[in-house]
Amino acid sequence: MEIASQEDHDMPIPLNTTFGGGGSHGHMIHHHDHHAANSAPPTHNNNNTTQPPPMPLHGNGHGNNYDHHHHQDPHHVGYNAIIKKPMIKYKECLKNHAAAMGGNATDGCGEFMPSGEDGSIEALTCSACNCHRNFHRKEVEGELAATAMSPYHQHPPHRKLMLNHQKIRSAMPHQMIMPIGVSNYRYMHNNSESEDFMEEDGVTTASRSLPNLPYNQKKRFRTKFTPEQKEKMLSFAEKVGWKIQRQEDCVVQRFCEEIGVKRRVLKVWMHNNKIHFSKKNNINLEDNDNEKINNLNNVDLSGNNDMTKIVP
């Protein structure tokens, strides 16, 4: 029993290399430690795990470094792929030499070839086509690989797809509400009491019938007059001076009853045709005045001719 207690008390000693006076004694203790570790029950190992970790493990540090590299390997790979300098190549020349003529013509240069060393001004000019490097198509290698390996470049495309999907989903109710409302509205008003229902519930029916407004709009009614009505209205308008005054209400009402036209319609007709007929009257008056002047001139000329004949 004392040996067992001594073994329990001396278990951590072989781990520390400073103890052990002789080499053989240290060797025996080290050998006994391996033997005890192999023959110890599981409960004894559990008690050892509760103790602080051994110094060699902390001193070497291989376990911690391994875990650290193991957990950060994916991030390092993606980060290295992002910061890696891409290989840029300039391919065929895209300069349009017929732009002034409104056409499209290229020189046929297939790849940019610098005229000088890197860093010099001549390196920006192509030795084949003598065009600037910006005219050549730029091709970057490694962009697809970096975006595919990096986890930060994979979320935005999915997010855009989801946003587009949400837009489609949000647009569907607006597209589906109108046909359903119209169908329900028609179903409710297919009976014989539809007109009475619309008159009683004017607010709700007006809001529900908004989609059908372009189809339910009626054309404005235009009154058609006979030639006799037009002549009588024209003569009456000229008499009253193309204005209806309050003192003439009785006369206007009597005239409207005679020709079969409402007072409001007569007033609108006079307002719309006042300028038109006034221009015609002015033109007719000018023509009449010109005819009178011409007639007077002809009379004077004929009189002068007679006088010339009589005098000799």
From Swiss-Prot:
Keyword Transcription regulation set for record? yes
Q: Where is this region: Disordered?
A: 20-74
Q: Which GO terms describe its biological process?
A: long-day photoperiodism, flowering
Q: In which tissues is it expressed?
A: Mostly expressed in flowers and inflorescence.
Q: Where is the composition biased (Low complexity)?
A: 37-50
Q: Which Gene3D superfamilies does this chain map to?
A: Homeodomain-like
**Keywords, comma-separated and alphabetical:** DNA-binding, Homeobox, Metal-binding, Nucleus, Transcription, Transcription regulation, Zinc, Zinc-finger
Record carries keyword Zinc-finger: yes
User: Site annotation (Required for DNA-binding): which residues?
Assistant: M270
- Main localization, broad class: nucleus
Q: Fetch the Pfam families from UniProt.
A: ZF-HD_dimer
Write out the GO MF terms. DNA binding; protein homodimerization activity; zinc ion binding
The UniProt induction remark is: Induced by exposure to long days.
Q: Where in the cell is it found?
A: Nucleus
Whom does it interact with, and what assembly results? Homo- and heterodimer with other ZFHD proteins. Interacts with ZHD1, ZHD2, ZHD5, ZHD7, ZHD8, ZHD10 and ZHD11.
The record, for PANTHER family, names:
ZINC-FINGER HOMEODOMAIN PROTEIN 2 (PTHR31948), ZINC-FINGER HOMEODOMAIN PROTEIN 4 (PTHR31948:SF177)
**What is stated about domains?**
The homeodomain differs form the typical one by having namely 4 instead of 3 extra amino acids inserted in the loop between helix 1 and helix 2.
Instruction: Give the protein's function.
Output: Putative transcription factor. Probably involved in the regulation of floral induction.
NCBIfam families referenced in this protein's UniProt entry, alphabetically: homeo_ZF_HD, ZF_HD_prot_N
Give the protein name, as stated in the record.
Zinc-finger homeodomain protein 4
Q: Gene of origin? A: ZHD4
